Every structure is written in structure tokens, then in C-alpha cells.
């Protein structure tokens, strides 16, 4: 059966051109049809292999091509990863994401990656990984280990992509998403706002995501975190309303997907984050760092949740785990500032 695109570029452009308050109203209506508007899914991201990446993504401090002062590290030991997962669960996260800075995993790494997935799943957490390009067999092995989600961002529109990355094609990214989907793993894929792209490019990114045969279950929208030493370090700041508008359009186009506020939250004030939740964002990364840049401290997130009347969402495997819920609400975790990193760098 042929796949028919759900959206056209002109339709998406019309959404971006709507008056902001009208757009937010529509996005909130769509959101309430599919989600509890007071619940936010909480994830933690750990860099399991940091730095020395051979790719040339211009936004990324982990690329070996740029002098950002980041020290390269080897793949973490399985038990180190699982200890971080235990801390994440104690802090209230329901999904544990593991990211590695490389173009693709080597076969010698696969047994360790499988053990990490199995260990995280044994704790009752959802497991997510972002490891770059996957082969069919690698995707299947991760699926067999129990991986719930695989993150592989498209970053921007096909037209603007070549200005940001030359070491991996757009089609390679789409092919990896297809292999992940075929293996039975849920897809997490989104992009970055602030790369120097136009509004048309933002529309083009969301068009690609929404028109996949099955849209991603999770759509992270990152605000560029400018890191000294990277080619995009001097880019203009992203206008908050432009970012909120992108969140709202993503919610309308992908009504059943989780839309995640990912990298860049440290740069957003409470009012901007609140408007993002109003626009339909319903997932965050929770922890002190996301790959090499700050993320709001846990207690700040909890204070904001209280102000807005939001609640952390539990996964099906954790439903009824009152202890886990209470831990999150009481913010008992001591921040582990050396381990949590920024999602936009993968």
C-alpha cells in the first residue's frame, strides 16, 4: 500500500504564519484531544561515550574537528551506566537515554550496549539509545535486548542540511529511522532551532517528520546551545516566540507524538517554558547536564511544575510505583553534574 503524505509545505507554512495566540489555541486543543495536559514525561540522558566523534556537525562540541576543550572518553563500563540509571530512577525519570558520540557503533561494542539496555529495563525504566547510524542487524539486536526508543534526529530540512553536516547524508538518517522502525523499536526524532535556518527550513523539518510512514513517537525540539569553538558559536539567539511557534506547529502536525523540550532549556526563562507547555510540549530531559551544556537543576524543574500545576508522567511499567513518584516530588536526588549532558550534541 502506497504511503500518502499527510502534509504539504504550503499547509505547514500557513500554520507558521498564523497569529501566535490563534496557533497556541489550536495546538492546545489538539494536545488535549490526545494527552492529559497536566502531565509531562520525564527523561534523563547520559553520555556513555563522549567526544572524538569523526563527524562534522557544526553545532556539536563532541566533534573531533573543533577545539572546544572537551576531553574524549571511551565507552563507559556497563555498571557505571546502570548506576547512573539507578540515580535517574531515584530522581523520578521514567526513561533513561544513553548517547554515544560516534558515527555508528562497532560490532565489538554491541554486547556491552545490549547489557546496558537489559540492565535499564530490569529496573523498570524505559530504555532509549542514540548511537548514530545502525545496520539492520544492529537495530534487531537492540530490539531483542528490549530497547524501547531509538533517537536519531534529522536536525533540519533536507535543503539546509548540507550547510550543517557533510559527513552523513540526510538519506542515511532516514534509512536508520526505517531500520529502527522495522525492528519494532519506537522512533525518537526531531531537530534544532537556531542553526541559521529559515522558517521555511523549520517547516521542511517538521514536514519530513510528520510525513514519515509512521510519525516519531517522540519529537525532541532543541534550541541551539552555542558552544565556543564550534562553527555556530556566534549564531544569533533564537527568538523565544519563534521557538514556541515551532513547538505549536509540531504539536498540530504530530498530535499523538510526545513533543520534548530538549537542549536549550537552560536559556529559557520560566515564562518561555510555560508557553512551550501551552503550545503542546509534554516531555523534558531532567538532570543537571545534557552532553556538554547545562540543563536546569531538578529542583528548578519541580518548582516550575508546581507553579504550573504539572505532574510528572509515569510509564505503564511504573504505574503504581508510589515510591518513585514521591521521590520525584520531593526532589531527593543530589545533582550528578559530571554525568548528564546535552541532547542537541547527538
Swiss-Prot record:
UniProt xrefs under SMART domains: BATS (SM00876), Elp3 (SM00729)
Record-linked Pfam families: BATS, Radical_SAM
Cofactor: how bound: Binds 1 [4Fe-4S] cluster. The cluster is coordinated with 3 cysteines and an exchangeable S-adenosyl-L-methionine.
EC category name: transferase
An example molecular function term from Gene Ontology annotations: 4 iron, 4 sulfur cluster binding
Any GO BP annotation: biotin biosynthetic process
EC number: 2.8.1.6
Binding positions for [2Fe-2S] cluster per the UniProt entry: 97, 128, 188, 260
Tagged with keyword Transcription: no
Record key words, sorted: 2Fe-2S, 4Fe-4S, Biotin biosynthesis, Iron, Iron-sulfur, Metal-binding, S-adenosyl-L-methionine, Transferase
Pathways per UniProt: Cofactor biosynthesis; biotin biosynthesis; biotin from 7,8-diaminononanoate: step 2/2
Residues that coordinate or bind [4Fe-4S] cluster: 53, 57, 60
Cofactor(s) required for function per UniProt: [4Fe-4S] cluster; [2Fe-2S] cluster
Catalytic activity: (4R,5S)-dethiobiotin + (sulfur carrier)-SH + 2 reduced [2Fe-2S]-[ferredoxin] + 2 S-adenosyl-L-methionine = (sulfur carrier)-H + biotin + 2 5'-deoxyadenosine + 2 L-methionine + 2 oxidized [2Fe-2S]-[ferredoxin]
Domain Radical SAM core: 38-256
Keyword Kinase listed: no
Function (record text): Catalyzes the conversion of dethiobiotin (DTB) to biotin by the insertion of a sulfur atom into dethiobiotin via a radical-based mechanism.
Family from the record: Belongs to the radical SAM superfamily. Biotin synthase family.
Binding partners and assembly: Homodimer.
Protein name: Biotin synthase
Organism name: Escherichia fergusonii (strain ATCC 35469 / DSM 13698 / CCUG 18766 / IAM 14443 / JCM 21226 / LMG 7866 / NBRC 102419 / NCTC 12128 / CDC 0568-73)
